[in-house]
A protein has these predicted regions:
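N-terminal membrane-anchoring/stem segments of glycan-assembly enzymes
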Residues: 2-119, 428, 457, 464-467
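Membrane-embedded multi-pass helical conduit in multi-pass membrane proteins
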Residues: 66-93, 102, 106-108, 117, ...
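Long helical/loop segments within the catalytic core of UDP-sugar-dependent glycosyltransferases
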Residues: 104, 178-180, 188, 196-204, ...
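Cell-envelope/extracellular polymer assembly enzymes that use nucleotide-activated donors
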Residues: 121-124, 153, 311
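Short, acidic, metal-binding catalytic loop of nucleotide-sugar glycosyltransferases
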Residues: 141-151
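A conserved acidic beta->alpha catalytic loop
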Residues: 158-167, 191
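Short aromatic/hydrophobic "clamp" motif used to bind/position activated sugar donors
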Residues: 211
């Protein structure tokens, strides 16, 4: 693969976002065959795919253990056997297993077809907004252009903004050319109470049984709502929510945004695909997901916590429901532009994961394929901890000739990492091509994402775990 062609999506290259991403988009509905990626080749039952992925991951891990005997002896001689075994397990063995499982899953993945319904159900869109005067008009513009035949109710939920969010949103609603099947209004709650409270109030005001949530700075592709609904109606009947694919909108703003573009385009997208294939999508993210009202009410709505979307998602899973994933239902969001904003966001995500474990730990013991991914998330805490406290100092030591931690064998995970990045790039590029989107060049962002992004992200994740475990005051840190 030519590395010069590796790139991430961009929707702000000298044009208005709306004109740019709609290029090549059909005005009419696609047939099920054209609108869904079904894949070709030999059909394999899902349990067999799961078994094959597990077998490959176990075999790769066994090979890694065999190759690491000398490394283990050297590190144990310099420290002790227990430390050496724990360090190498979380530096090499476990990441190797994860990469091998992810790689084999991506190779085996075939998106199930969507069924186009005869009629589309009415849908309420909840737009959570706090100090979004700069972005809310674009968000509403994207909603006004939705190619959706059913009725749409748009509720802008102003959570006590201190800027002109209400005025800008109200003016946009009055000026935009909404279709006859679309209604829109602003609910101004006056006081900032948190995103969960605003969404729960919006749910009580909503008139329809399908509830879509987006953030006040998100931009939804023209067929985004339609494809989310089609996926929800096409998936098994126990599916009560579907997560859309969220990508980066402001990738040209600075170097940090360019790196995050790859995180969304590759990292997050590959994990969502993996979980979705095994009926185990763990998070219907608040930035762009659709829910059935019944499931929201049975789960008690959005909980008052910093990670309300993941805790709600796990509550839905605990009710024995399923969450799906629509890889071609696209929305674009503005990511943090400063190190401080990025750190606060990822700390919030890490706290949300710990909140979900504390609230819904029985999910760890369900007899489902998706239980593997719950345990996968359990491993994040020691993985991030060892990476931050052991591997990063080991990299510094390697610069002075001490290779006990970061030695030649640590590169054993690189072949799998390169392979799955190449595969997910090809998959994602195919999605964008079918959607009429441009994949722009972003080599420098990719190199930073591949070589140094973890050095920034993992310590922040550890920070989030610690403050949640120690019970520090909860605060919604905005972007």
């Amino acid at each position: 693969m030519d590395i010069q062609r590796l790139s991430g999506p961009d929707v702000t290259a000298g044009e208005t976002p709306l004109d740019h991403v709609e290029r090549g988009e059909a005005d009419c509905f696609k047939s099920p065959a054209a609108g869904a990626s079904t894949g070709k080749g030999l059909y394999l039952p899902l349990p067999l795919k799961f078994a094959l992925a597990c077998s490959f991951a176990i075999a790769w891990t066994a090979l890694s253990v065999w190759l690491s005997f000398r490394w283990l002896d050297d590190l144990a001689g310099a420290t002790n056997f227990a430390f050496a075994l724990i360090a190498i397990t979380f530096i090499a063995y476990l990441p190797g297993f994860m990469n091998a499982f992810l790689l084999s899953t991506l190779v085996l993945d075939r998106r199930p077809p969507r069924v186009v319904p005869v009629s589309y159900p009415p849908t309420t869109i909840l737009v959570a907004a706090y100090n979004e005067q700069a972005a809310i008009r674009d968000t509403l513009t994207s909603l006004a252009r939705q190619d959706y035949p059913g009725s749409i109710e748009i509720l802008v939920l102003n959570d006590g903004s201190t800027d002109n969010t209400v005025e800008v949103a109200t003016r946009a609603i009055n000026e935009l050319d909404f279709a006859a099947n679309v209604s829109a209004r602003v609910l101004d709650f006056g006081v900032n109470r948190g995103k969960a409270a605003a969404l729960n109030d919006g749910l009580r005001e909503a008139q329809h049984d399908l509830i879509l949530t987006i953030d006040g700075d998100s931009w939804v592709k023209r067929d985004g709502l339609r494809k989310l609904v089609e996926r929800l109606l096409s998936d098994p009947p126990e599916t009560q929510a579907v997560a859309g694919a969220v990508m980066v909108r402001n990738s040209r703003e600075n170097f940090l945004c360019r790196a995050q573009e790859w995180d969304y385009f590759h990292g997050i997208a590959s994990v969502k695909r993996m979980q979705g294939m095994y009926h185990g999508t763990l998070v219907a993210q608040g930035a762009f997901s659709i829910y059935r009202r019944k499931a929201l009410e049975q789960a008690g709505g959005w909980p008052e916590c910093v990670g309300e979307d993941i805790v709600l998602s796990w509550a839905i899973l605990r009710l024995n429901y399923r969450i799906g994933y629509a890889d071609d239902a696209l929305a674009f969001t503005n990511v943090p532009t400063t190190i401080r904003q990025f750190a606060l966001q990822r700390k919030r995500w890490s706290r949300g994961l710990m909140e979900a474990f504390k609230a819904h730990w029985p999910l760890l013991f369900r007899r489902r394929m998706s239980t593997l991914f719950i345990w996968w998330n359990v491993c994040f805490l020691p993985l991030d901890l060892i990476y931050t406290l052991v591997f990063m100092p080991g990299l510094v030591a390697a610069c002075f000739g001490y290779f006990y931690i970061a030695g030649p064998l640590t590169i054993a995970v690189l072949p799998l990492t390169i392979l799955w990045n190449g595969i997910i790039y090809r998959i994602q590029s195919g999605v964008y091509r079918r959607e009429g989107l441009i994949v722009r060049q972003n080599l420098r962002g990719f190199l930073f994402y591949a070589l140094a992004y973890s050095l920034l992200m993992q310590p922040v994740c550890v920070w989030g775990y610690v403050v949640e475990l120690l019970g520090f005051r909860k605060k919604w840190d905005t972007k």
